[in-house]
UniProtKB/Swiss-Prot annotation:
Its EC number is 7.1.1.2. Belongs to the complex I subunit 4L family. The keyword Mitochondrion applies. GO terms for biological process: ATP synthesis coupled electron transport. This is NADH-ubiquinone oxidoreductase chain 4L.
Length: 98
């Protein structure tokens, strides 16, 4: 089981490095964030299954709900930026005003 945790930690680290290195495009940043959330979900689910915590079994589902909300907001922001400016660069996000 330690190999599974090591793989999930590696997946989280690779996603975090991708977020830090390829942060010029919004779509790349969103994909890296989704990879981080997926690795966190799998790690939390495996930890709860291994420790037999019945009361904490809803925590991974709550994490998935927040990940879905984050993805929906990120994609709506991506559509708004690409319709307004024609590109999905992250530096265009500070130009959005209400």
């Amino acid at each position: 089981m330690a190999l599974t945790y090591m793989n999930m930690a590696l997946a989280f680290t690779v996603s975090l490095l991708g977020l830090l290195m390829y942060r010029s495009h919004l779509m790349s940043s969103l994909l890296c964030l989704e990879g981080m959330m997926l690795s966190l979900f799998v790690t939390m689910a495996l930890t709860i299954l291994n420790s037999n915590l019945v009361l904490a079994s809803m925590i991974p589902i709550i994490l998935l709900v927040f990940a879905a909300c984050e993805a929906a907001l990120g994609l709506s922001l991506l559509v708004m930026v690409s319709n307004t400016y024609g590109v999905d660069h992250v530096q265009n996000l500070n130009l959005l005003q209400c």
